[in-house]
């Protein structure tokens, strides 16, 4: 099964049959975005405009955590007992800029405690979030454009300056190849990252 978000719905697609097999609606969602799956099979979905993370558990899709300190959550990734969140930033403006860009957050899955990864120094309007396989994470900055590696201590290293629109990303395991869709350029960039 493939799971995707679609504005206010989580959609399950049966790849073998080539059709939608189920949908769950989040009535109060404003803009569902990224998703991640924990070790128990629960699916977490960010609502960037609603400062909410939804969860599909036992076939029930509901708000799991709503908090302004999520800073407009975008990218998600499960790391053991924590849900990592790549937020867009604080004080979202009409043009989607923020007064304070985002930095990685960690949410304890058991207690829902939100903490900052590292110093909390702003990195960017974060979109994509994927582990690098070595204890750090790749993130993209959609507004300014860029691919970063963020260490487990929260230190950000700019790997590549890019155009605006560097969106969600994917990592081809074992190859250190990062795929970044460039929404404004209508292309996907493949990068070999060491």
Label for each model-derived stretch:
Residues 14-19, 56-60, 108-112, 150-155, ...:
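Short loop/turn segments that connect beta-strands within beta-propeller blades
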Residues 9-46, 50, 63-64, 72:
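Asp-box/WD-like beta-propeller blade repeats and closely related beta-sheet repeat scaffolds
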Residues 5, 48-49, 92-102, 142-143, ...:
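Short, solvent-exposed loop/turn segments at conserved positions within beta-propeller repeat blades
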Residues 9-11, 52-55, 103-105, 146-148, ...:
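A short loop-to-beta-strand structural motif that recurs across blades of beta-propeller domains
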Residues 99-157:
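Glycine/small-residue-rich hydrophobic helix-like segments
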Residues 1, 55-60, 77-81, 149-155, ...:
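Flexible "stalk/tail and boundary" regions
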Residues 1-2, 26-43, 69-91, 98-101, ...:
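Beta-rich, blade/repeat-based domains predominating
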């Amino acid at each position: 099964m493939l799971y995707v978000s679609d504005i206010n719905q989580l959609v399950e697609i049966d790849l073998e049959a080539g059709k939608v097999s189920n949908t769950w609606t989040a009535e109060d969602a404003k803009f569902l975005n990224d998703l991640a799956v924990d070790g128990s099979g629960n699916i977490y979905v960010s609502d960037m405009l609603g400062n909410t993370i939804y969860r599909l558990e036992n076939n029930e899709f509901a708000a799991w955590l709503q908090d302004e300190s999520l800073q407009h959550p975008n990218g998600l990734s499960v790391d053991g007992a924590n849900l990592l969140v790549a937020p867009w930033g604080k004080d979202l403006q009409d043009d989607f800029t923020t007064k304070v860009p985002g930095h990685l957050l960690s949410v304890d899955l058991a207690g829902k405690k939100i903490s900052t990864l590292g110093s909390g120094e702003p990195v960017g309007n974060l979109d994509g979030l994927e582990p690098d396989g070595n204890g750090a994470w790749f993130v993209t900055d959609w507004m300014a454009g860029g691919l970063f590696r963020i260490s487990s201590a929260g230190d950000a290293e700019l790997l590549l300056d890019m155009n605006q629109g560097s969106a969600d990303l994917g990592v081809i395991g074992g190859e250190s190849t990062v795929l970044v869709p460039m929404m404004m350029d209508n292309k996907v960039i493949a990068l070999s990252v060491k």
